[in-house]
From Swiss-Prot:
Pathway: Protein modification; protein lipoylation via endogenous pathway; protein N(6)-(lipoyl)lysine from octanoyl-[acyl-carrier-protein]: step 1/2. It comes from Desulforamulus reducens (strain ATCC BAA-1160 / DSM 100696 / MI-1). Substrate binds at R75, G76, G77, D78, V79, T80, Y81, H82, A143, I144, G145, G156, F157, A158. This is Octanoyltransferase. The lineage of its organism: Bacteria, Bacillati, Bacillota, Clostridia, Eubacteriales. It comes from the Bacteria.
Amino acid sequence: MKLFVAKLGEIDYQDALTMQEKLLLLRQQNKVEDIMLLLQHPPTLTLGTRENRYNILVPEVELKRQGVNIFKSNRGGDVTYHGPGQIVGYPIVDLNGHGKSIREYVHKIEETFIQLLKEEYDLTASRESKYHGVWLGNEKITAIGCAVKRWVTMHGFAFNVNTNLSHFNLINPCGITDRGVTSLQKIFGQPQDMEKVYKQVITYFSRVFDFEPEIIDDKKLNEIVGRE
């Protein structure tokens, strides 16, 4: 199966959400192939469908002072952080071709990063029975929060590569108070090559989901999004 992959650089959360919603509709109508957006966001907190405002630990004025935006999202989960140095993936995938199981879909995203971390970085990551995501010990390195509409997915994952982890101190990530967060930069003590990691994400996601990836440029993406 083909998977279009679009790398967008850094993009505001609302702009990415608007693009996802357009692609979701097109995929539901079978007017486009499965597609994954890979990008980074400026410092942003997003609130999922199980949001609890008590998990934001500082006043909104302090968030503004630090240049952190807040958005309400229709993904699953509570509050999470996105920012530069974090690879965010938004797969718009028709689950009719992938077992029509939300649980299996999340499991495969987790498997993507478990394999990537083991084979590329010799890190043994795992799942947690209580929480979604990918963990190294008690620290989360990949957050997962999805939405599914008429069996087409949106939202997705956030992989901490060179993320500013201090911004996670503004929240209880995903409402979790007894665990931490980590990144490749923290583990190895130096920034990682983002382009290299982007390629790894594409490779392992495609392998786990049995996709043939095709990288598309901005022109192609705009042509796709323009289909109404």
